[in-house]
A protein has these predicted regions:
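Short pre-catalytic strand/loop immediately N-terminal to key active-site residues, enriched for Gly-Thr
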Residues: 12-18, 199-213
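Conserved N-terminal subdomain of the carbohydrate kinase-like
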Residues: 2-11, 23, 31-115, 262-272
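N-terminal basic/disordered segments at the start of proteins
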Residues: 19-35, 297-303, 307-312
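Charged C-terminal helix
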Residues: 6, 54-57, 235-317
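Conserved phosphate/ATP/ADP-binding segment of small-molecule kinases
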Residues: 122-199, 208
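Phosphate-handling active-site elements
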Residues: 33-38, 198-200, 226-241
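Short, small-residue alpha-helix embedded
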Residues: 24, 29, 147-148, 210-233
Length: 318
């Protein structure tokens, strides 16, 4: 459990200058899930809603400096790991995880395969990511990445994917989230498969939209935040799945980019702000400027601070 009211969540991942994926999506997701987000950059990615243009990987020494800057100053409640780029970066992150307390939950989103099916990592780096799986609490591969991890064919339905995940969860001694969003089905259920073979499924319906850029980053970051807040795997996945479904529902309204746009990470707070303007309460901007114009309450204020509160409330104390 976090010591403060907000779990402090570190994202270790690449970037997205258009804000839909990578650390930019991570920070918004962490905030939406009730956490305080921090990030360490593994790779600078020139991408937008239409695709990736180029990737620049800073020296691993700079990655080390970023990690040291965080851990020297901030107590971490949860970690989310995204794009690792190469074997050297993966090894450095693995070393960093060994320095964390055992009760800090770590979520790995193994970015290994592009939506097109292209492999993003060299064979050595893929093996390093496989090894890293045994150091984390839970992994969130898409179906293509699950197939790469297990050296199997890509699953054609959720039940087949769950069976494959059971194999990897047992072998790597880590929980595996199976994501049904890429399946050709009216449902988009997720499931968490534990090393003991138990499965907890979370129902979700498919949303008819092309704007799903960064959904993997967003789900894993929200999941890490809820785990950092003390939720169980099942409770964290349930919250994150339902939140992400709503974010996808509201994605089209953002109108960001010409390709596959981002989801609306802050849809809940946006709706609250819009609703606030319709509440039946007085307009209070002038209350503090001219308190003498506000009716005095029937009971005299006990002091200046109480008087100030009554003035701000516009005398609506009943």
């Amino acid at each position: 459990m976090p010591k403060g009211i907000y779990p402090r969540v570190l994202s270790i991942a690449g970037t997205d200058p258009t804000g839909g994926a990578g650390i930019q999506a991570d920070l918004k997701s962490i905030a939406a899930a009730g956490g305080y987000g921090m990030n360490v950059v593994t790779a600078l990615v020139a991408q937008n809603t239409q695709g990736v243009r180029s990737v620049h990987v800073p020296p691993v020494e700079f990655l080390q400096e970023q990690l040291e800057a965080v851990i020297d100053d901030v107590e971490i409640d949860a970690v989310k790991i995204g794009m690792l780029a190469d074997a050297a970066i993966t090894a450095k992150v693995a070393d960093f995880l060994r320095r964390l307390p055992e009760d800090v939950p770590v979520v790995l989103d193994p970015v290994m395969v592009a939506t097109s099916g292209d492999r993003l990592l060299e064979q050595e780096a893929e093996q390093a990511v496989r090894d890293l799986c045994s150091q984390v609490d839970i992994i969130t591969p898409n179906l293509k990445e699950l197939a790469v991890l297990t050296n199997t064919e890509e699953a054609g339905d959720l039940e087949q994917a769950i069976a494959t995940a059971k194999q990897w969860a047992k072998e790597a001694s880590t929980a595996v989230v199976v994501k049904g969003g890429h399946l050709d089905s009216d449902i988009a259920d997720n499931a968490v498969v534990n090393p003991d073979g138990s499965v907890h499924r979370v129902s979700s319906s498919r949303v008819d939209t092309k704007n799903t850029h960064g959904t993997g980053c967003s789900l894993s970051s929200a999941l890490a935040t809820r785990l950092g807040a003390g939720d169980s795997h099942t409770a964290a996945l349930t919250w994150s799945t339902h939140w992400l479904h709503e974010a996808i529902v509201h994605a089209d309204a953002l109108q960001v980019g010409k390709g596959h746009g981002p989801v609306d990470h802050l849809h809940r707070s946006q709706r609250l702000m819009r609703a606030a303007s319709t509440l039946p309460q007085p307009y209070l901007s002038g209350s503090l400027k001219e308190p003498e114009n506000v009716e005095q309450p029937r009971v005299p204020a006990a002091g200046p601070h109480t008087q100030r509160l009554w003035n701000l409330a516009g005398n609506h104390w009943e």
